[in-house]
Amino acid sequence: MLRLASLKFGRLFRYAKVLFAASLLVVMLLNTHSLLSSFQRNELTDRRFLSLNKCPACFGTSWCRKFMNGQLSFEGWGRLRLLDFFNVKNVHFAQYGEPREGSRRVVLKRLGSNHELSELDQRICKKATGRPRCDLVQAMYKTDFARLNGDVRLLTPDVVEGWSDLVHCPSQRLLDRLVRRYAETKDSGSFLLRNLKDTERMQLLLTLAFNPEPLVLQSFPSDEGWPFAKYLGACGRMVAVNYVGEELWSYFNAPWEKRVDLAWQLMEIAEQLTNNDFDFALYLLDVSFDNFAVGPRDGKVIIVDAENVLVADKKLIKQNKPENWDVWYESKFDDCDKEACLSFSKEILCSRATVDHNYYAICQNLLSRHATWRGTSGGLLHDPPAEIAKDGRLEALLDECANPKKRYGRFKSAKELREYLAQLSNNAR
């Protein structure tokens, strides 16, 4: 009986797929004219498509000239707006061309789904007018995004604390860094807010509240060795970042030597974001195989989704000395039945000088046998060679890093794991 039900379900699933494909074909045939025009027209030069008409309720304008000049165009099937229905994250691939440099691939992001962007518009309107629809441009001047006028000297923690993960517990030092490195102004380099235009201040604050990823990329740039994708610019509600390469997930079944190297890099990223010369701890609150990519030439691992990064100023923690500030904090292992689970307390991340969160996140969600993603298990270091499996050291270190049995076991095992992976990687070369 069970087998019969399974067969029936299988047939129904196949029929559903066929019906879906047929429906899609019909829709495409009915929209042949619009499909052809989509291929012929470069919508990245359209102000309304870019939501440039909504500025300053947007993310910036630094790249608008490049968009309007036709220097950016969607790749292949990405030109079909019909397929946007399936692109929930609103992430697109495009070609960007410079006259003397040729073209290269870039990634375009709207920083949210259509639903999230629509909700943003409604919140702005309700705040300003009490109604869900309004003139966004006028409404922006009646919101918290416009509360900082030209007389305000600094962006201070009391204004933006808790707006997003980036500023869950902001220090003045962090906010000065965000303003000084803000790329959507011609006069960047100063931490004084009054050097920004009114519209630029509003765009900065809106980005900080809606999705601070651009500000993370600008404040901790790849040019200075931070493991994030390079920020290029914005036009309206379309942000351009450098294309890194295939996502980490595509290397899940790569040769063992390659996976060992990637695992070592991931642990190095965890270390860099936790302990660095700037005394900022950047904690990754969303860690999955989709949030990292690998460069095709240099094989370098880069973070490509930085929306959920909490920055704690360890210099301020050491200065203010909140309760238990110097007690090492061990993150709690989360044995949940969902993908990419993490257990953390933002308040503790903000108040302890020594935290193992990044090691925990990388080990549990990417490297160890506890990592699950898209129906797979075993993590990036699954199925090691027989001699390594027999030795047992790798499995023991991964287990202790993900789910420590000893006090402060994760701190010790993370350090040993980095060293062991470096050794394995060197031996494989």
Swiss-Prot record:
> What biological processes does GO assign it?
cardiac muscle cell proliferation; regulation of phosphatidylinositol 3-kinase/protein kinase B signal transduction
Q: Does the keyword Repeat apply?
A: no
- Which InterPro entries did the record assign? DIPK2A/B (IPR020519), FAM69_kinase_dom (IPR022049)
For this record, an example GO cellular component is: extracellular space
- Principal location class: cytoplasm
Q: Which residues form the signal peptide?
A: 1-34
UniProt entry keywords in alphabetical sequence: Cytoplasmic vesicle, Golgi apparatus, Secreted, Signal
List the subcellular locations: Cytoplasmic vesicle, COPI-coated vesicle; Golgi apparatus; Secreted
UniProt key word Secreted: yes
Q: Which domain of life is it from?
A: Eukaryota
Q: What does this protein do?
A: May play a role in cardiomyocyte proliferation through paracrine signaling and activation of the PPI3K-AKT-CDK7 signaling cascade.
Homology family: Belongs to the DIPK family.
* PANTHER family on file: DIVERGENT PROTEIN KINASE DOMAIN 2A, GH11358P
Query: How is this protein named in the record?
Result: Divergent protein kinase domain 2A
- The record lists the organism as Xenopus tropicalis
Recite the lineage of the species.
Eukaryota, Metazoa, Chordata, Craniata, Vertebrata
Gene encoding it?
A: dipk2a
